[in-house]
């Protein structure tokens, strides 16, 4: 039993929290902005738990969808489903249970939030299949990873104002930036199996594309800060995030696999910088 639970934990990447953090930071930015400061703590924990559950469900669905491809990729061939340690139906069952628990969390919230939760689940569940035909699936990932933004505004304000969609667009650019660096790690394997990724699509302009996406992300988040009238700590946070992006350039410019992966992981700190600036800006108002 314990061995089975360990395999399920690996399936949903409990040992690799970076994905949850990249999903969580935009949600937290939005919660603070929507509430004008710290949100109600009950709502805060609903969104934190929902983020963890939906990211875990997404990992299970992703492994199920990619099970015939992952065996040809060095980094993924030892995943529990790919290695034959669990069955395909088990991965689907785990994903379904996690998604249902996540949806149960939003049942006490307003109708708009519940409808957006359904949309978010559809986007998360269909993302793995976009890698079959969409040249930049990372953009779709950005929608999936950023959907906590409109949901946060909906839960707190019972509306989704334009600034929320602006932030969602910013998150799309951020996701393309960090996940292109991630895709650079697997590019050779993805070319062999015919998988679509932004790293392949951008080709020799991959590094330039990543930096342009960071610039677009920062510009759109700056616009959001202006619309919300945020004070100087927010701008310090954005400046620190820009510094993180500059550091990522030093890691990815030589296209070394391990350094590209390090750049991907370091985006946790970029998201944290934006959150810290946001939280302090509201705290001193």
From Swiss-Prot:
Biological process GO annotation list?
Answer: ubiquinone biosynthetic process
Q: Which GO terms describe its cellular component?
A: plasma membrane
In the record, what terms sit under GO molecular function? Answer: 4-hydroxybenzoate polyprenyltransferase activity
Question: What is the membrane topology noted in the UniProt record heading this document?
Answer: Multi-pass membrane protein
Catalytic activity line of the entry:
all-trans-octaprenyl diphosphate + 4-hydroxybenzoate = 4-hydroxy-3-(all-trans-octaprenyl)benzoate + diphosphate
Q: Quick one: where is this thing mainly located? A: membrane
Give the main EC class. Answer: transferase
Q: What is its EC number?
A: 2.5.1.39
* Pfam families membership: UbiA
InterPro entries per UniProt: HB_polyprenyltransferase-like, Prenyltransferase, UbiA_prenyltransferase, UbiA_prenylTrfase_CS, UbiA_sf
Cell compartments where the protein resides: Cell inner membrane
Gene3D superfamilies on file: UbiA prenyltransferase
Pathway given for this chain reads:
Cofactor biosynthesis; ubiquinone biosynthesis
Q: What function is annotated for this protein?
A: Catalyzes the prenylation of para-hydroxybenzoate (PHB) with an all-trans polyprenyl group. Mediates the second step in the final reaction sequence of ubiquinone-8 (UQ-8) biosynthesis, which is the condensation of the polyisoprenoid side chain with PHB, generating the first membrane-bound Q intermediate 3-octaprenyl-4-hydroxybenzoate.
NCBIfam families, alphabetized: ubiA_proteo
Q: What is this protein called?
A: 4-hydroxybenzoate octaprenyltransferase
What is the primary gene name for this protein?
Answer: ubiA
């Amino acid at each position: 039993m314990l061995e089975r639970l360990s395999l399920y934990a690996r399936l949903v990447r409990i040992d690799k929290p970076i994905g949850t953090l990249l999903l969580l930071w935009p949600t937290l930015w939005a919660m603070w902005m929507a509430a004008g400061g710290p949100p109600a703590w009950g709502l805060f924990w609903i969104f934190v738990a929902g983020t963890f559950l939906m990211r875990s469900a997404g990992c299970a669905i992703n492994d199920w969808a990619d099970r015939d491809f992952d065996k040809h990729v060095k980094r993924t061939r030892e995943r529990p489903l790919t290695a034959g340690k669990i069955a395909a139906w088990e991965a689907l069952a785990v994903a379904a249970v996690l998604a249902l628990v996540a949806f149960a969390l939003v049942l006490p919230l307003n109708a708009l939030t519940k409808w957006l939760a359904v949309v978010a689940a559809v986007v998360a569940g269909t993302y793995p299949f976009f890698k079959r035909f969409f040249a930049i699936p990372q953009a779709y990932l950005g929608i999936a990873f950023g959907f906590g933004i409109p949901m946060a505004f909906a839960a707190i304000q019972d509306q989704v104002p334009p600034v929320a969609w602006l932030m969602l667009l910013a998150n799309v650019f951020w996701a393309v930036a960090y996940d292109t660096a991630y895709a650079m790690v697997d590019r050779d394997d993805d070319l062999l199996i015919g998988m679509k990724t932004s790293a392949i699509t951008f080709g020799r302009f991959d590094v330039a594309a990543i930096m342009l996406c960071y610039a677009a992300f920062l510009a759109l988040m700056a616009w959001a800060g202006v619309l919300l009238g945020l004070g100087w700590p927010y701008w310090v946070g954005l400046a620190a995030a820009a510094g993180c992006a500059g550091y990522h350039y030093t890691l990815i410019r030589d296209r070394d696999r391990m350094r590209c992966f390090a750049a991907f992981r370091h985006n946790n700190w970029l998201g944290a910088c934006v959150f810290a600036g946001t939280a302090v800006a509201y705290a001193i108002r």
